Regions:
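Core segments of cupin and vicinal oxygen chelate
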Residues: 9-52
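Vicinal oxygen chelate
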Residues: 3-12, 32, 42-47, 63-133
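Flexible, active-site-proximal loop/turn residues at the rims of small-molecule/cofactor binding pockets
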Residues: 36, 79, 126
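A broad, low-specificity signal marking well-ordered, structured residues that form hydrophobic/aromatic
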Residues: 42, 53-55, 110, 120
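Short, charged/polar, Gly/Pro-enriched secondary-structure boundary elements
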Residues: 49-53, 65, 116-120
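Acetyl-CoA-dependent GNAT
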Residues: 57-62, 125-127
C-alpha cells in the first residue's frame, strides 16, 4: 500500500498547538477549516513529506486528549546538529522534556510532551524501511 498518512489528534487549544508544532518542529500550516459540522481544524506539514498532522477542536462536544506515556510520534534525525537544534526549538516552543516510559528512547533520543500530554521523541539516529531477515 502506498499512502499519505494523516495523524489526527483532538486538542484543547487549537492555536496553541499550531504555534507549538510550527515553532518547535518546523511545520507549516497546509490547511484549515472552521465549524465543519462543529469541528475546527488545522493541518500541519511540509512540502514533500508523506505525512501531516491534523489538530481538531470540537465546538459542540469537546474531546479531551487522552494520550498515554507510550503514544509516541518519533522523528529520526541522524544529523547531530539538526537533532540538537530541533531539541532546542522544541523547548523554546513550550514542549517539556520528560523521561521516556520505555528506556530505549532515552538512549539516543529525547522525549518531549506538548501542552495536551502528547509525546514526541526526537531520536538521534537514522531509520531505514528495509526488511531485516
Amino acid at each position: 500500500m502506498q499512502a499519505h498518512l494523516r495523524i489526527a489528534r483532538p486538542v484543547r487549544e487549537l492555536e496553541k498547538s499550531v504555534k507549538m508544532y510550527c515553532k518547535g518542529l518546523g511545520f507549516v500550516e497546509i490547511g484549515r477549516f472552521a465549524d465543519h459540522e462543529g469541528f475546527d481544524g488545522v493541518m500541519l506539514g511540509r512540502p514533500g513529506l508523506s505525512y501531516h498532522f491534523e489538530f481538531t477542536f470540537c465546538r459542540v462536544h469537546p474531546v479531551a486528549p487522552a494520550p498515554t506515556a507510550e503514544d509516541l510520534i518519533v522523528f529520526y534525525l541522524p544529523d547531530p546538529s539538526e537533532w540538537e537544534s530541533t531539541c532546542r526549538s522544541a523547548l523554546a516552543a513550550g514542549f517539556v522534556e520528560v523521561k521516556s516510559f520505555n528506556p530505549y528512547w532515552d538512549r539516543l533520543g529525547r522525549t518531549f510532551e506538548d501542552h495536551d500530554g502528547y509525546r514526541v521523541v526526537l531520536q538521534r539516529a537514522a531509520w531505514s524501511n528495509s526488511v531485516s531477515s
